[in-house]
Amino acid sequence: DEELEAIRSRVLHMGGLVESQVRTALAAFDKGDLDLAQQAIDADRRVNDLELELDQMVIHVIARRQPTAGDLRMIIGTAKSIMDIERIGDEATKIARAVKWLHEKGAGTRMQRVPDIQHSGEIAVSMLRRTLDAFARMDVAAAAAIIKDDRGVDDRFRATLDPAWLRAFHH
C-alpha cells in the first residue's frame, strides 16, 4: 500500500502543478502578459516529466505486485487520470502559446474582447480542483457529479471558442 500511496501523492502533486499552470495561462491570456505565458509553457516540461515518472511507478507496481482486482481497477483509473491531467497541462500550454502568437500578430490588446474565456477557464480550474479533492478522498459520488458537470462546461467552452470571435483577431 505504500507504493499505491506514493503514486496517489505524486498524482496530487502533478495535479497541483497543472492547476497552477492553467491559472498562470489564464492570467497571461487575461492580461496579455508574455512573462506569464512563458511560465505556463515552461511548466509543461515539469508536468511531462512527472507523467513519465508516474507511468514508470504504475508499471512497476503492476509488474511487481500483481495487484488484486480492486487495486488493479484503482491503478488503471489512476493511470487514466495521469494522462488526463497531462492533457490539461497541454491545453494550458496551448493557451499560453496563443497569448504569444496573438501578441506577435498585434492582437494582444484585443484579447479582452473574447467572450467568456476567463469565466470558462475559472470553471475548468474549479472542476480540476474538485476532481483532485475527490481523488484525494477517493470519493466516487463527488467524481460522478463532476463528470455530469463536465458535459455542460464542454458545451459552454465550444460556444466560447466559436470561430466568429477568432475572425476579430484578423481585422
Language-model segments: residues:
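Cytosolic, long alpha-helical scaffolding segments
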Residues: 1-171
